[in-house]
Amino acid sequence: MRRSRGLLLIPFAVLIATGLVVRGQQASPLVLLGVGLPAVDEGPIPDETHRPFSPEAIRRAAIHAADDPVRRGRGGRAFTAGRVIVKFKDAASEGARDAAVRSVVASGVRQPRTASADFDVVTIDPAADGEAVAAAFRARPEVDYAQAPYRVHATLVPNDPLYRSSPSFSPGQWNLQMLNLESAWDIQPQAGSAITVAVVDTGLAYMNTTLDVTIGAFVDELGTSHPALGHQLIPYSAATQIVGAGHASRIVAPHDFVWNTNTPLDFDGHGTHVSGTVGQLTNDGIGTAGVAFNVKLMPVKVLASDWDVAFGGSPFVGGTDDMVARGIRYAADNGANIINLSLGSAGPPNCGTQPNQDGCSPVIESAIRYAVGKRCFVVIAAGNDAEVTDPDFGLNPTSVIAEIASRVPGAVSVAAVDRRALGQTGARRCTGDPNLPDCHAYYSSFGPYVELSAPGGSDRSFGRDGYVWQQTFDFTYTDTFDPAITPTYGPPRFDILAYVGYIGTSMAAPHVSGVAAMLMQQGITDPAAIEAALEKLGIDLGPPGRDDKYGFGLVDARAVLRGLGLAR
């Protein structure tokens, strides 16, 4: 997919809003005209709602609106210059915190604490070494941890036009069959109706509106420059298979940390696809199915897309650790039962034993522990770097966010299997034997931190029949800046949806989130107990017992629910 071509570590949207001058140009806000629910097939919606950005959004934009120089740190991870993340000890007074900042970097400014954060952001000279400044803060007695704002990205496999082609839908949802979901739905027909799943990602196509935007000149994530297109009215529609007639109430506490609004619209398609796997409407006679099709969905946008950049909401594509941490904490504080993180970043392999080294993500680990402490089950994609050789970390680098799960009971990291695992049961295992093939997806990162496996798909053995399919935007109308998709650059359309095939551990993680929602619906609400059940009752793939490719095995929805004594 374009969204992760090259799997660059690209950071979070920091808002540029009304009235700000950036690089000598006045940025324009995103205005939503005619906002409404439910989905597009429910008829026209009166043009009556305008939502310009708030003064708080503009204030934050002023903090972050500088050019976004990217640095590759000594620890190997890319980070954004000009700021550091600092967690002061609770006992430290405000005066002591300000004194610590002055001591470490005379020109540093501790910014006002933002919502959903227990840490501070200190702005520094963009020319300063952010990792060196963070190390100096870590040496202070008032500080719990400090780090550079390392970059993260969606865990989707690199670009191939075929990944997103959808003129027909011949393969069926082999991925749901693999999890024994038909039997699981018989056991738990409510399929998570009392459970809220937060998808911390690129947003969600959950409303009908018109985007009133000015498209400026921008550089996409591959480094290609595109000219300004000026003022545009762009149609936007809800994914009818996620928010259909009578289902608007399933969207709970949406929030956008890119634009700092409560309307986290997806301009990429990744977050919508992931949300569909978790909870796409089922038993409605059309389209595809989701795992826990009655769940409530909480879209939390923390990753910017190319169009977020073009619309003036972010100077870059992707996200940073501090924004992911805020998204996790927001979800935990606003009623999420399960948090899905289909995102990641390669980094050091030993953050568990050496958490203060450059390249680790203590701010995200703190947020995950906070969420689990509030009885949220956290699911993290294991990463897509099995065949990647990182210049600092070598072949198959560790996904530092997924690695956190291995030391937090109640959080799990999820590797991907491909369609070859379909039908594997009991003693039959995926091995190197050609009659019992290795069904680990070729791209799926592996290591001691992998705990579970789920369908992520693959194009190598099955072509398009090996993808994971859900409803999301038709890329033909959204990726208008990509000459491999459309020959002429122009404004996008977000009102045309299709059944689209993706592959990646981004796709594997939401299968586990959906099964966990069904377990919670059944009464297992302790995150550590959910993890234990999923691991104990999974289908053992590979060598007997836990291994670095499959973890404890393939999630088996029927076996997990039957483990509660419900025999169907």
Q: Where are the language model's segments positioned?
A:
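C-terminal subdomain of the subtilisin-like protease fold in secreted/lumenal serine endopeptidases
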Residues: R329, N334-S342, G410-S413, A498, ...
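Active-site glycine-centered loops adjacent to acidic/histidine catalytic or metal-binding residues
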Residues: D201, G383, G504
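Extracellular S/T/G-rich loop segment that most often corresponds to the catalytic His/Ser-adjacent loop
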Residues: C376, A402-M518
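Bacterial N-terminal signal peptides
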Residues: I10-T18
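Active-site core segment of subtilase-fold serine proteases
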Residues: D160-G319, M323-C360, R369, V388-D390, ...
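A cross-family glycoside hydrolase active-site/sugar-binding cleft signature
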Residues: P149, K301, N340-G344, A381-A382, ...
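Primarily auto-inhibitory N-terminal propeptides
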Residues: L20-P167, W185-I187
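Acidic glycine-/aspartate-rich tracts in secreted/extracellular proteins
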Residues: D90-S93, V152, T202-Y206, T210, ...
